[in-house]
């Protein structure tokens, strides 16, 4: 099939989609407002004059490119068109007079954008209702999005490469009893963007409480990621007196993220908002037990009580207690970790998830008309 993605070419998730479908023998074109190269795929870059991190007002410049998008699609004549992110690329697709196309919602386009104003809400409704087929990475996000459209969603989770994300990255470690008697650190952490919605401040405060209430615990905190609150969080760690046990790893690529998760005794994802818990899925694939906050997108990505421990969001004390209990119980860490990998490999393995999307494409490709 000829598949055309209308999505940011420099985004990791876009690239993952392109690589998988290219490797299946499909011809891939990407229409993007950001520059980027994707091996084996054709990227049609449109300079909209708005940066990827520009304001909503700046990104209105995307919309005047609808005619250009139409022209490119008309030239490609794809069998499948899939726009990604409802309130930028999805809106352009809605204005471009395209054949029936798919729209994949991502997260902030559903959870944050429509709450800014009535105009933002109407823009999202317009985008959702113009698409022929709607895709969501989670049931939780589909439920949230259903406030803005009566159209049904097909659930297409973000898949994880279970060969890359694997306990084999650090064979033989982690399942001994972690305490000061054997001199090994208790390594906890997360791999997330450093912004308020992901609960990084809660994680820092919980770590400080754990250290204060149980000074015998040899805890080491690892945080991988970049983001707008980075300086604020580093200052908070210093204020809390945990800067000497906190390792700020910065942005790391997927290969290093797999190693980071596999090397942890416990993964922490205390998000306050999450469309789908990709980080929790990656951690579980590495046999790393996880503690998550009680938000639907994270709970859907785990099996609470079987592969994860759930604590209330924004509650550092409850998180600190869960971290301590996980430290004390090596058997529980082992059982959660083993169950987590089994769950992910059976439910969210990369090929399983993309094969489902491919089958959806095949089923509807015959309905896609030429421009």
Language model features: what each stretch is:
Residues 103, 124-171, 176:
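Donor nucleotide-sugar binding/catalytic pocket of nucleotide-sugar-dependent glycosyltransferases
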Residues 4, 181-207, 222:
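Conserved donor-binding/catalytic core segment of Leloir-type glycosyltransferases
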Residues 73, 128, 251-252, 259-264:
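Short alpha-helical donor nucleotide-sugar binding micro-motif in glycosyltransferases
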Residues 272:
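Aromatic "clamp/platform" in nucleotide-sugar-dependent glycosyltransferases that forms part
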Residues 234-252:
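Nucleotide-activated donor-binding/catalytic signature segment of Leloir-type glycosyltransferases, i.e.
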Residues 289-292:
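Short hydrophobic beta-strand element within catalytic cores of glycosyltransferases
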Residues 304-305, 309-316, 325-330:
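Conserved acidic donor-binding segment of nucleotide-sugar-dependent glycosyltransferases
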Residues 1-42:
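N-terminal subdomain of nucleotide-sugar transferases
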């Amino acid at each position: 099939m000829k598949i055309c993605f209308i999505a940011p070419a420099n985004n990791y998730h876009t690239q993952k989609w392109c690589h998988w479908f290219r490797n299946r023998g499909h011809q891939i074109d990407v229409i993007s407002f950001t520059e980027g190269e994707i091996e084996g795929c054709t990227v049609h870059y449109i300079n909209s004059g708005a940066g990827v991190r520009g304001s909503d007002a700046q990104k209105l410049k995307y919309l005047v490119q609808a005619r250009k998008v139409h022209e490119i699609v008309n030239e490609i004549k794809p069998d499948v068109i899939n726009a990604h992110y409802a309130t930028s690329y999805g809106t352009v697709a809605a204005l471009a007079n395209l054949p029936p196309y798919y729209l994949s919602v991502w997260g902030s386009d559903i959870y944050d954008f429509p709450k800014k104003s009535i105009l933002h809400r109407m823009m999202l409704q317009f985008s959702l209702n113009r698409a022929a087929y709607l895709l969501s990475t989670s049931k939780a996000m589909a439920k949230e999005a259903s406030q803005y459209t009566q159209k049904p969603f097909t659930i297409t989770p973000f898949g994880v490469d279970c060969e890359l994300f694997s306990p084999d990255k650090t064979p033989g470690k982690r399942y001994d009893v972690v305490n000061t008697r054997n001199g090994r650190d208790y390594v906890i952490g997360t791999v997330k963007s450093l912004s308020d919605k992901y609960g990084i401040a809660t994680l820092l405060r919980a770590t400080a409480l754990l250290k204060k209430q149980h000074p015998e615990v040899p805890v080491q905190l690892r945080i991988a990621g970049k983001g707008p609150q980075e300086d604020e969080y580093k200052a908070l760690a210093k204020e809390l007196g945990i800067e000497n046990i906190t390792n700020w790893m910065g942005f790391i690529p997927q290969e290093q993220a797999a190693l980071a998760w596999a090397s942890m005794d416990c993964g922490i994802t205390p998000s306050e908002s999450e469309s789908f818990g990709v980080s929790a899925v990656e951690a579980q694939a590495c046999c790393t037990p996880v503690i998550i906050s009680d938000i639907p997108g994270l709970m859907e990505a785990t099996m609470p009580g079987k592969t994860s421990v759930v604590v209330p969001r924004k509650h550092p004390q409850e998180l600190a207690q869960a971290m301590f209990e996980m430290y004390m119980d090596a058997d529980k860490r082992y059982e959660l970790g083993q169950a987590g990998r089994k769950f992910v490999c059976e439910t969210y393995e990369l090929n399983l998830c993309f094969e489902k999307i491919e089958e959806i494409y095949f089923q509807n490709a015959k309905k896609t008309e030429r421009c």
